[in-house]
């Protein structure tokens, strides 16, 4: 399930360089994180929905690849993003 337009715009404005910055790595990771968090609630209710679980695993994998890329290119931006999203404990 995708996010609403308002939720997407809020994430883009919060993590992007400007209101139209949808392609930066930080925005992509933040959008994937929001979708993953939304799907986790779905799976609490629908435990046997394996078709959607495959999509969730694909999103997690894509987020991991983007985070690896960001860590390789700019460690400072990577650590800031991880702290803002609360991905590492």
Swiss-Prot record:
Alphabetical list of CDD domains matching this protein: Ribosomal_S15p_S13e
Alphabetized SUPFAM superfamilies for the sequence: S15/NS1 RNA-binding domain
Entry keywords, A to Z: Ribonucleoprotein, Ribosomal protein, RNA-binding, rRNA-binding
One GO BP annotation of this record: translation
GO CC list: cytosolic small ribosomal subunit
Any Pfam family matching the protein: Ribosomal_S15
Gene3D superfamilies, sorted: 6.10.250.3130, S15/NS1, RNA-binding
Superkingdom of the source species: Bacteria
UniProt cross-references to InterPro entries, sorted A to Z: Ribosomal_uS15 (IPR000589), Ribosomal_uS15_bac-type (IPR005290), uS15_NS1_RNA-bd_sf (IPR009068)
Record-level Gene Ontology MF annotations: rRNA binding; structural constituent of ribosome
Subunit structure: Part of the 30S ribosomal subunit. Forms a bridge to the 50S subunit in the 70S ribosome, contacting the 23S rRNA.
Sequence similarity: Belongs to the universal ribosomal protein uS15 family.
Purpose: One of the primary rRNA binding proteins, it binds directly to 16S rRNA where it helps nucleate assembly of the platform of the 30S subunit by binding and bridging several RNA helices of the 16S rRNA. Forms an intersubunit bridge (bridge B4) with the 23S rRNA of the 50S subunit in the ribosome.
The protein's name in its UniProt record: Small ribosomal subunit protein uS15
Name of the coding gene: rpsO
